Amino acid sequence: MSISISSTSYLPTDQKIWKNLSLLTKKITFNEYANLHSGFNHNYKIDYSIFIIFFHDLLGINANEKVKIFLKNLKDYLKKYNSNVLVALSNYDGNNNVIENAKNLIINKKIANNFKKNIYKLTTLYNNLLFVDLDLPFSYYGYKEIFDSRNWYTYHMRISYKTLSIIDKEIYQV
């Protein structure tokens, strides 16, 4: 079995961190971070293509366009290949302004919610597509322990090392 992992943020490749997935296979490859599309471009059979998306990484002027491109590439990939695809998403955007969030659904949240809705819709059309909402296990542990801005400046990794074991466990369970 082979697993290919693409992410919007840097993920360490040490097998010890990915201990649950390593139980399934030793053939785990990590694509270039911040380049989700590299996960779609390969000429060999992959049993599981995993896309780990931190929506905060997609924010900016072209966020909506980035989402549309990813969804189009995902649909094309699902039609072309028979491999399993897992999309793991956290749409936490770091905006903890209670007042701002009380009255308006911020445009970034609208885009994130629409993205999630489209992924769920695709899971009904393609049996080989799975979705993991990372915000569910993350909320259990608390966002303060999950996201670590110090890691962003050091490694371009938004999350703590503890979070990596949570992601590994959640993907393994699916």
What is each stretch, according to the model?
Residues 1-35, 41:
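Serine-esterase "nucleophile elbow" of acetyl-processing enzymes
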Residues 91, 127-144:
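Acidic carboxylate-rich catalytic motifs and surrounding loops in phosphoryl-/glycosyl-chemistry enzymes
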Residues 63-76, 107-119:
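Well-ordered, non-membrane alpha-helical segments in soluble/globular domains
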Residues 17, 145-174:
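Histidine-centered active-site loop/cap adjacent to the catalytic His
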Residues 14-18, 60-62, 96-103, 142-144:
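A short acidic (Asp/Glu
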Residues 77-85:
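A short helix->loop->beta-strand "cap" motif at the edges of active sites that frequently abuts
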Residues 37-69, 90-101:
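Oxyanion-hole/transition-state-stabilizing segment in secreted/luminal serine hydrolases
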Residues 97-132, 164:
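Substrate-gating cap/lid alpha-helix
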